């Protein structure tokens, strides 16, 4: 399973680290993924991985079990 937010589809960003001499090395900025139990409109519960930002939104909407 990819490191991707199950609800928003966000994934890691790629770029370069730059040293003081401006040497470039590839790197990734991974998401802060959390496992969460979520309830949908029908009342069924399932486990998904969401980012910390999405987790805040779910808590606000009271969708977390």
From Swiss-Prot:
Q: Which NCBIfam families match?
A: L28 (TIGR00009)
The cellular component terms of Gene Ontology attached to this UniProt record, alphabetical and capped at eight, are:
ribonucleoprotein complex; ribosome
- HAMAP family reported for this sequence: Ribosomal_bL28 (MF_00373)
Assigned keywords, A-Z: Ribonucleoprotein, Ribosomal protein
- Write one Gene Ontology MF term: structural constituent of ribosome
UniProt record similarity statement: Belongs to the bacterial ribosomal protein bL28 family.
Segments carrying the region annotation (Disordered) are 1-26
tRNA processing as a keyword? no
Q: Which InterPro entries match?
A: Bacterial_rp_bL28 (IPR050096), Ribosomal_bL28 (IPR026569), Ribosomal_bL28/bL31-like_sf (IPR034704), Ribosomal_bL28_bact-type (IPR001383), Ribosomal_bL28_sf (IPR037147)
According to its UniProt entry, one GO biological process term is: translation
This protein is called Large ribosomal subunit protein bL28
Does Ribosomal protein appear among the keywords? Answer: yes
Q: Which gene encodes it?
A: rpmB
Ranges of Polar residues compositional bias? 11-22
